[in-house]
């Protein structure tokens, strides 16, 4: 009888654990249509290097950007949608600048100011900052509540900037972020 109770207890705990794991899997991943964007670390001198992907998924709350990145510098980084579908370098003031062909922050409504992703008077391409852990990985999803459909972002690029983002143009323009460090074209 004791063996039977032990087996029953193990079976019940196994079923419960499987149910919890299954529920977690469904909660952790948005279920809508999605596209995967390949991301490269920008290095015009030595060639770009693959650092992973960002999956963009439609949800009831807006577009969810789920990074699966590695090999990046630890810390918070500016994370945006840029105007053009290019990650190529471009010359500015006689100097080759990484990712400059991507253009500026995507601003189809002409807001002309940097801000939070939920702010109606900010660039539509302003996303929450990307968190990179001490081991160089980024896996925390971010939500863009004003963006609803994948077709809105196709034909643009995802840009990761060195350094954080204060979601303002003050004291420094465009959130005070640094150079463009990684990019992916949204197809």
From Swiss-Prot:
Cofactor note as given: Binds 1 copper ion per subunit.
Signal sequence, renumbered to the chain: 1-23
PROSITE patterns: SOD_CU_ZN_1 (PS00087), SOD_CU_ZN_2 (PS00332)
Pfam families to which the protein is assigned, alphabetical: Sod_Cu (PF00080)
Protein family per UniProt: Belongs to the Cu-Zn superoxide dismutase family.
Role, per record: Destroys radicals which are normally produced within the cells and which are toxic to biological systems. May confer survival advantage by accelerating dismutation of superoxide of environmental origin to hydrogen peroxide, disruptive to the normal mucociliary clearance process in the host.
PANTHER family: SUPEROXIDE DISMUTASE CU-ZN -RELATED
Name of the protein in its database record: Superoxide dismutase [Cu-Zn]
Organism name: Haemophilus parainfluenzae
């Amino acid at each position: 009888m004791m063996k039977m109770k032990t087996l029953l207890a193990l079976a019940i705990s196994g079923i419960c654990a499987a149910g919890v794991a299954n529920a977690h899997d469904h909660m952790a991943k948005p279920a809508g249509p999605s596209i995967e964007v390949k991301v490269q670390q920008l290095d015009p001198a030595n060639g770009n290097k693959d650092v992973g992907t960002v999956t963009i998924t439609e949800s009831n709350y807006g577009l969810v950007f789920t990074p699966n990145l590695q090999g990046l510098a630890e810390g918070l980084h500016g994370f945006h949608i840029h105007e053009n579908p290019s990650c190529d370098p471009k010359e500015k003031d006689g100097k080759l600048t990484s990712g400059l062909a991507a253009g500026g922050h995507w601003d189809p409504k002409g807001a002309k100011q940097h801000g939070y992703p939920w702010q109606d008077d900010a660039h539509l391409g302003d996303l929450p900052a990307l968190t990179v852990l001490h081991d160089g990985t980024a896996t925390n999803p971010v939500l863009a509540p004003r963006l609803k459909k994948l077709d809105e972002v196709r034909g643009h690029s995802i840009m990761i900037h060195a350094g954080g983002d204060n979601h303002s143009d003050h004291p420094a323009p465009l959130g005070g972020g640094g150079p463009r460090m990684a990019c992916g074209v949204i197809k």
